[in-house]
From Swiss-Prot:
Keyword list, A-Z: Amino-acid biosynthesis, Arginine biosynthesis, ATP-binding, Cytoplasm, Ligase, Nucleotide-binding
Species of provenance: Mycolicibacterium gilvum (strain PYR-GCK)
Protein name: Argininosuccinate synthase
Family: Belongs to the argininosuccinate synthase family. Type 1 subfamily.
Positions with a binding annotation for L-citrulline: Y87, N123, R127, S175, E260, Y272
Entry's EC annotation: 6.3.4.5
Amino acid sequence: MSERVILAYSGGLDTSVAISWIGKETGKEVVAVAIDLGQGGEDMEVVRQRAIDCGAVEAVVVDARDEFAEQYCLPAIQSNALYMDRYPLVSALSRPLIVKHLVDAAREHGGGIVAHGCTGKGNDQVRFEVGFASLAPDLKVLAPVRDYAWTREKAIAFAEENAIPINVTKRSPFSIDQNVWGRAVETGFLEHLWNAPTKDVYDYTEDPTVNWSSPDEVVVGFEKGVPVSIDGNPVTVLQAIEQLNERAGAQGVGRLDVVEDRLVGIKSREIYEAPGAMVLITAHTELEHVTLERELGRYKRLTDQKWGELVYDGLWFSPLKSALESFVANTQEHVSGEIRLVLHGGHIAVNGRRSSESLYDFNLATYDEGDTFDQSSAKGFVHVHGLSSSLSARRDLAGK
């Protein structure tokens, strides 16, 4: 038996076409691997059967929902990861997990080639191929969409000519990627920056402009940086994301219309929905404001940004990311407590905080009676703090 091709299969246009195309052009057997990341929508058995219908000799579905939440989304929560201060890495977080399971499938099913359906314009080609090179440098990589310059029109035409079962049409050409952490929509009329998204773009969130009858108040509890409760009820990380997706999504929270800087050098417009992710990152960030010492918090904000950039750039398996996570793990020792948030009209508002690890001292902070702050020490502090600036200013004035 010749070496098999192990394909990262989403059930969408490009990877459905890829199964048939690889078989026709290379003569090799294709094993399709679909990863359940909590994306919802179609039943995964339907996706698996579609891969078989498209020509795969085997189709494997891996339930990786808890793994994704605990080993990929949780580090993003603890690093308050927002690329360009906005994008919660919806797609970027899932790619290294898919890579891991594709490598496992290659070992199990006799695959010498791994394949993906990424274009040459996107970030995912980098995330997949750098991941393969890191975990399994012996495997060859096939990227038919990129290497043979497929366009969406060509892919649709190929699918129609070969009776490939897909739902995409030329009139509805959105490219959609989704998982429990969020949903990403691109292409079509969204490529024109002035075009406003239409209702059919969204799925995880309700229209935030609707006059909702009442806000939703939610309390998120953390232990050492891990979300462990919603309104006092124990939850796993996956359950926390799922429950907040539903509650925040119902309030229109988590819609993002972003023009982002891609790794390949171009700018791209993306529409994201990440209700649960945005609530958890907001709550975790607020709890860190309460529990982290000032200089540690300042420095961690720098590492948070770098961690997000590394993940976005496909460097999940890099030594720097690993080192940053060791630092982040140390910072989470005291990040325990509860944050109360109000979800309403597309907005998240924090209105309560409590923690046994809090560095907020009421007696030091209050301006009422009982104030224990020694204000007599402030005059000397101000003088010493500004000494270098005053000396420099004195020199500059003397030189005029």
